[in-house]
Amino acid sequence: MTNIVANYKTFLVKIVVLAIGKTDESWIQEGIDKYSKRLKHYIYFEFQIIPDLKNRKNLSESQQKEQEGRLILKQVQNTDLLILLDEKGKEFHSKGFSDFLQQKMNAGIKRLVFVIGGPYGFSAEVYAQATSKIALSKMTFSHQMIRPFFAEQIYRAFSILNNEPYHHQ
């Protein structure tokens, strides 16, 4: 596979991370902001928050997933590549994840949309629309904690693709 080690802005690729619910803690938001700012050097990157459901406490788990699913799918365009962060997804080491991103960008995808679901995961409709599922770990993390972890992993992937010293083998 040919490596495209360049500023991906040239190819108009955009990475969007969708997350359900506002970020609860300022230190979590600081982590997201830190890596979002660093990523702008490489690619168009956006972290979008889908507002919490109103009356969430009065909804069943399946109702929450269905309603959140509708909100997620409203944000997704027909040409997007929808990738879910899911505990049953494929696990990558950092180099493998950078290769995964490279492959998607080389395929001419204009928007890679990664979704961090709510506390109960995703609706069947969201699973049906997704092209891939990835897992960051076999361990379970809150949907809040995953936000800065995943932003850092995307940054790490781009540092690997650009042969920069951030990642150590």
Feature map (PLM): residue ranges:
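N-terminal beta1-alpha1 ligand-phosphate binding loop
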Residues: 12-39
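N-terminal amphipathic/basic-hydrophobic helices that include classical n-h-c signal peptides
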Residues: 1-12
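A structural signal for isolated positions on well-ordered beta-strands in alpha/beta enzyme cores
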Residues: 14-18, 46-48, 113
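Structured adenosyl-cofactor binding patch, chiefly the S-adenosyl-L-methionine
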Residues: 124-168
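Conserved RecA-like P-loop NTPase ATPase core
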Residues: 17, 83, 117, 150
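S-adenosyl-L-methionine/SAH cofactor-binding core of RNA-modifying enzymes
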Residues: 43-45, 49-110
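A mid-sequence interfacial segment
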Residues: 98-137
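Short glycine-rich anion-binding loops that position phosphate/pyrophosphate groups of nucleotides
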Residues: 23, 87-90, 118-121
